[in-house]
Each structure stands twice: as C-alpha cells, then as structure tokens.
C-alpha cells in the first residue's frame, strides 16, 4: 500500500465535499503537505555497523507499521488544526469552496478506488515461466535437448553464490549441459573432509572423476551477504546462527589477510577485498582434493577464480599457478 493510500485510509470520514458544504465553519485553502513516518524497526543503519544476519530464534512476519501524518514545517499543525484552519478559510473566502470541494472529492475517490494490482501467485509464476522456456527454447532447439537426453559432458564446474542476483547461467550465458554448477552461501569450497561438507566433496568428485570437467571456476560477487557476515561475525565466542557462522568461516583465512593488510579501511572496501580473497582461499582448498591435484599435474584440469560486480556490470577472471610438482620417493 502506498503512503498516500495509507494516509487516505486513516483520514477521518468527514473529509468530503458534501460535509464541507453543510459545515458552519470552514478552513483556509492551500496545499497541505504531509510526510509520513513509519513507526517500525526498519530504519537504515550505518554501513560500518556489523549486521546481525540471522537470529537463532523463529522469525515471524512483522506487524503492519503504524503510519501517522505529521505536517511539515510549512505549518507544524496537527491534523485537526489543519482541518479547522481549512474551514475557517472557506468561511472567509466562500469563493474557494467549489475548488476545495472538487479537490476533496478527488482525494475521496482516490482513497475509495480498489487496488488493481493482482496479488503474487507463485504457482502461476512457475507455470508461466516453464511455458515461456518450453515455447522459446525447448521446442525451438530439439537437437540440443535430444543430445542432453543421452547424457551430459560439461566442460566447466562452477562454484557460485546462492544469491538470487548472480545466477551463473544467466550472467555467463551458459547453455544447458555446458556447466556443472554448485551454489552455496558465499560460493565457498571447504577443504577435503570425508565427515564434513560431504555435499561439496561429492560434487567435486563427480565433476572431476566422472564428468571429466576441464575447468573449475570459483566465482565471487559484489555485495555478498555471506562475505559481509564473515567480516563482521566475531571470530570467537557463542554463535548467533545455527549454520551460517560455521560455514562462512571456511574462508576465515581470507578475512584474516584482509584485516591484517587493510586495517582501518572502511568495512565496505574490506568486504570487496574479501570477496576476491575468499575465492583464492577456495581455490587453495580445492588442492586438498587428491583427484583435483592429479588433474592439475596431468594438465587435464585447470582452476580459475572470478568476481562478478553487478553494481558496475564488470567481471574479473584470473588463474592461479600453484607450481605443483610430481611426488618423489626416498
């Protein structure tokens, strides 16, 4: 609901043309400007203030904010005082009454008009999305989808963030069958561990040993909430989340490096640096997987890092040379 609609719904019911014509007193004409203040907890905070991303408690829908009209410094009047002033003005200048009546009729009609915006229908959104895909892509490219029905042989494995703004298939125009994609909070790759993070380990193993991907990309992005959490969560002490803090600390070495080398830099700038450094940490963690190291030695696999800046519309790509050597025996 717009501020104007909310104001109209809270306005007294006597504000209409007919009631003013019958009133024994009137008010001065003029433009009464109002501002609206929302008595809720959604005030913006400084970018340097550490955010509390997730609370370890149920989150419920917030109640509708209380919207109250406050008159600007033009008059500094209460609502009732403004109405009384309007009545007084109309008594003194009766010729303004038709103009005021017409304007009030317009406001009343606007307030009474139904909201024509249809409510969001998630099922309809999914249906229409699939229909669009099928008619514009699936039906128009039968050769591709016939081939995909036989199996997949992607050249790329991509680690990307779960952030809804950075879908790698959209950003990099990957076609179906072209990239084996893993998405998680802050696009992180944990080190090899058979008991923890097995979902990531299984994906890497399948991509390298079975799909025979040739490239593994780890792609960070601008304004990453997971990285901001990493930079602002305390390194020690009790957690405020069930999963997030433990997960983002996979790239704690990136935070440590940024803080050590850029202490005193604004938090926003530190986050940008950490977004890229965390990619390098993940690339390093990939080296802890034996089959990844084997692929690098045999030159059947390459690792690359990237950073997508959706604010400025730029993309950085880099490769790391780890200088791996063949094992020696003594």
Curated annotation (Swiss-Prot):
Gene3D superfamilies: Carbonic anhydrase. It is found in: Cytoplasm. Its EC number is 4.2.1.1. Keywords: Cytoplasm, Lyase, Zinc. The keyword Cytoplasm applies. One of its GO terms (biological process) is carbon utilization. SUPFAM superfamilies: beta-carbonic anhydrase, cab. One of its GO terms (molecular function) is carbonate dehydratase activity. It holds the Pfam family Pro_CA. It comes from the Eukaryota. It catalyses: hydrogencarbonate + H(+) = CO2 + H2O. One of its GO terms (cellular component) is cytoplasm. Residues 1-109 are annotated as: Chloroplast transit peptide-like. Reversible hydration of carbon dioxide. PANTHER family: BETA CARBONIC ANHYDRASE 2, CHLOROPLASTIC (PTHR11002:SF56), CARBONIC ANHYDRASE (PTHR11002). Belongs to the beta-class carbonic anhydrase family. Possesses a transit-like peptide, but it is proposed that this peptide is not removed and that therefore the enzyme stays in the cytoplasm instead of going to the chloroplast. This is Carbonic anhydrase. It comes from Flaveria bidentis (Coastal plain yellowtops).
